[in-house]
A protein has these predicted regions:
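Flavin-dependent oxidoreductase catalytic cores
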Residues: 1-177
């Protein structure tokens, strides 16, 4: 059903079609049935999706995310993670991500980018806007109260998204946007 919606957008003349909120880790949901690119086994399904969009005259662009503090994962018994302790719109309180977790998430972004390319997507988009999702929350001085290499100065707060971009670039071909 979801694919049909995006194919109709492509048929309507869109140059590219962004499928939003494609998570790098299915344990951290953003919305009810979050689309994910966190397993190699999902590539064939995404390939069919990307092919349908391409056949309709467009390119599929997954917006790769980790919902971080906006995760809806309480029903799974998982505490949302973020740069610092914050309360999300659902009233869930996130805990600060450890350096080890941050490094794992960076790798997950790179793998998701590789999977998107393998599936024939036209590129990827990374969500880091308005203090939302994990990278955006790290950028925000209001949400990021860390005092390590991922907090404090703007250079440190930007470190996560810059490392994510670098990891994505390492995992895809030079001409994959």
């Amino acid at each position: 059903q979801l694919a049909d919606i995006f194919v109709r957008r492509a048929e309507g003349g869109a140059g590219y079609v962004v499928i939003d909120a494609v998570t790098v880790d299915h344990k951290y949901w953003y919305i009810g049935k979050t689309t994910a690119l966190d397993k190699d086994s999902l590539v064939p399904q995404f390939k069919k999706f990307a092919t349908r969009v391409k056949d309709a005259g467009s390119e599929l662009i997954p917006q790769i995310i980790h919902p971080g503090p906006e995760s809806i994962c309480a029903m799974k018994g998982i505490t949302p993670i973020g740069p610092s302790i914050n309360t999300n719109a659902n009233g869930d309180v996130s805990r600060p991500a450890t350096i080890k977790e941050i490094q794992k998430i960076i790798k997950q972004y790179g793998k998701a980018a590789r999977r998107a390319e393998e599936a024939g997507c036209g590129g990827i988009a990374l969500h880091a806007a308005h203090a939302y999702m994990l990278p955006g929350a790290f950028l925000s001085p209001l949400r990021n109260k860390r005092m390590d290499e991922y907090g404090g100065t703007i250079d440190n707060r930007a470190r996560l998204i810059l490392e994510i971009i670098e990891e994505c670039r390492k995992n895809v071909s030079e001409d994959f946007p």
